[in-house]
């Protein structure tokens, strides 16, 4: 996965620069989300990974599935990715594009992991505290994981705030080992 994102990043940067130059960030977000969803489909993934399928057939099928929802530049991106055997990294390109867009807009992505689903009020309070801490708008998603036992774990970029019971128990065990 790390290799795929490394390969995808230059494509995402190039597309982001083009989209920003043409004032078409929203259009590109939609096109990349669509293309990523198509590329991530189980049947399409098998088709993409099949060495017996030639590039022309892959390009034709992929573009026919996307219909008229890609503009000329989007179609050219698909053709380029097919030509260089990179169509399978479309989900990573889309994710990197969205990360660049969020960074440029001053928005931070946060993933909140909780043992139980937080209420709307709790979720709003967490987001407000994160926005105050980082001084930026925060878009958060919640993942429920009973394995953390209680509390929450928050990941914002490279920052991890582990206020989970499991994390505290692991820290205690580490401290006791000396």
Swiss-Prot record:
GO terms for cellular component: plasma membrane; proton-transporting ATP synthase complex. It is found in: Cell inner membrane. Keywords: ATP synthesis, Cell inner membrane, Cell membrane, CF(1), Hydrogen ion transport, Ion transport, Membrane, Transport. Signal peptide: none annotated. The keyword Transmembrane helix does not apply. SUPFAM superfamilies: N-terminal domain of the delta subunit of the F1F0-ATP synthase. GO terms for molecular function: proton-transporting ATP synthase activity, rotational mechanism. F-type ATPases have 2 components, F(1) - the catalytic core - and F(0) - the membrane proton channel. F(1) has five subunits: alpha(3), beta(3), gamma(1), delta(1), epsilon(1). F(0) has three main subunits: a(1), b(2) and c(10-14). The alpha and beta chains form an alternating ring which encloses part of the gamma chain. F(1) is attached to F(0) by a central stalk formed by the gamma and epsilon chains, while a peripheral stalk is formed by the delta and b chains. NCBIfam families: ATP_synt_delta, PRK05758.2-2. Belongs to the ATPase delta chain family. This is ATP synthase subunit delta.
